[in-house]
C-alpha cells in the first residue's frame, strides 16, 4: 500500500480541541492620497471579510483532515482582530484588537478521544489547574501551542512554540517534547532541523494553527514525530502565501500524502 492508501484506510480520529477563538475582520481598501489634517494616508474603504481565527482556525484545519473535533472555546465576539489592508500594495496598515475578559473554563472529566489539542493564547480561558488536570489524567497524546512563557505548567505533552516565544521562555515543559518553529526557515526539534520550502511570504497569520493541526493529524496517523513535523512545516508554508487565516484544501493535503 502507498502511504496515502494506508492513511485513508485508518479510522477517523476524534480530537478534543480547547482554546481561545477570535473573529478576524479584514477591511480592504486603497490609499491613494494623504489626509489634509495630518500626514497620514486616507483609507478608501472597499469591502470587509470575516473569518474565524485562533483556535477556530485550528478546528477548521483539523476538519480538513477529516478529524472529528469536539471544541471547547469562548464566544468569538469577545476577541476581535480588525485589520486594515491596502489592496494595491497588500500592505497591512493597522490592526485594532478588541478584547473582553474571558471566563476560565472548568473541566473535571475528559471525553474519550484520540488526542487533546490545546491552543493557548493566554487570554484567560485556560487556568493552570485545568491544564494540570489534562496533562495528568489524559492517557493519549497532548499537543500544545502556547503563548505562556512558563512552560513548566505543561507536562507529558508535545509542546510547540515559535522562535520569539523561545527567547521569552522562563522554564521548560516537563517530560515533554519541545518543537520550535522558525518562521520561513522551518522548525527544530531536539537536534534536528526541518527546512521549509522557499515561498513568497504574504502573511504569517494562522500559519502556527495549520502547523498544530497538521502535527496532530500526522502524529496520530504515523506515530512518528519526525514525519509529523516535516508535514507540518510543509503545509504551514501554504498558509503564508495567502492574506489572512487559511484553511487547507484537499489539493494541499494530497501533496503530502
Where are the regions that the model predicts?
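Hydrophobic/aromatic beta-strand patches that form the interior of the parallel beta-sheet core
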Residues: 16, 70-72, 94, 143, ...
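Conserved phosphate-binding/catalytic region of the ribokinase-like
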Residues: 100, 129-142, 146-155, 170-257
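Core dinuclear metal-dependent hydrolase active-site scaffold
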Residues: 2-9, 183, 187
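Conserved beta-alpha-beta core of the PfkB/ribokinase-like small-molecule kinase fold
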Residues: 32-38, 81-99, 115-172, 185-186
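Active-site metal-binding loops of divalent metal-dependent hydrolases
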Residues: 20-21, 121, 210
Amino acid at each position: 500500500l502507498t502511504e496515502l492508501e494506508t492513511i485513508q484506510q485508518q479510522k477517523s480520529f476524534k480530537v478534543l480541541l480547547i482554546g481561545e477563538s477570535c473573529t478576524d475582520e479584514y477591511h480592504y481598501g486603497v490609499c491613494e492620497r494623504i489626509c489634509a489634517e495630518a500626514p497620514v494616508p486616507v483609507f478608501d474603504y472597499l469591502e470587509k471579510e470575516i473569518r474565524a481565527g485562533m483556535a477556530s482556525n485550528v478546528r477548521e484545519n483539523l476538519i480538513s483532515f477529516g478529524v472529528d473535533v469536539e471544541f471547547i472555546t469562548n464566544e468569538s465576539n469577545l476577541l476581535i482582530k480588525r485589520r486594515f489592508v491596502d489592496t494595491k500594495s497588500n500592505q497591512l496598515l493597522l490592526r485594532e484588537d478588541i478584547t473582553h475578559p474571558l471566563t476560565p473554563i472548568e473541566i473535571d472529566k475528559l471525553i474519550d478521544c484520540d488526542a487533546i489539542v490545546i491552543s493557548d493564547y493566554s487570554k484567560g480561558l485556560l487556568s493552570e489547574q485545568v491544564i494540570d488536570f489534562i496533562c495528568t489524567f489524559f492517557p493519549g497524546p497532548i499537543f500544545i501551542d502556547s503563548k505562556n512563557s512558563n512552560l513548566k505548567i505543561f507536562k507529558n505533552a508535545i509542546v510547540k512554540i515559535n522562535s520569539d516565544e523561545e527567547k521569552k521562555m522562563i522554564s521548560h515543559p516537563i517530560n515533554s517534547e519541545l518543537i520550535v518553529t522558525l518562521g520561513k526557515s522551518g522548525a527544530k526539534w531536539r537536534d534536528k532541523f526541518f527546512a521549509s520550502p522557499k515561498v513568497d511570504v504574504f502573511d504569517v497569520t494562522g500559519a502556527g494553527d495549520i502547523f498544530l493541526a497538521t502535527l496532530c493529524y500526522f502524529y496520530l496517523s504515523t506515530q512518528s514525530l519526525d514525519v509529523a513535523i516535516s508535514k507540518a512545516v510543509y503545509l504551514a508554508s501554504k498558509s503564508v502565501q495567502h492574506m489572512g487565516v487559511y484553511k487547507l484544501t484537499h489539493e494541499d493535503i494530497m501533496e503530502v500524502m
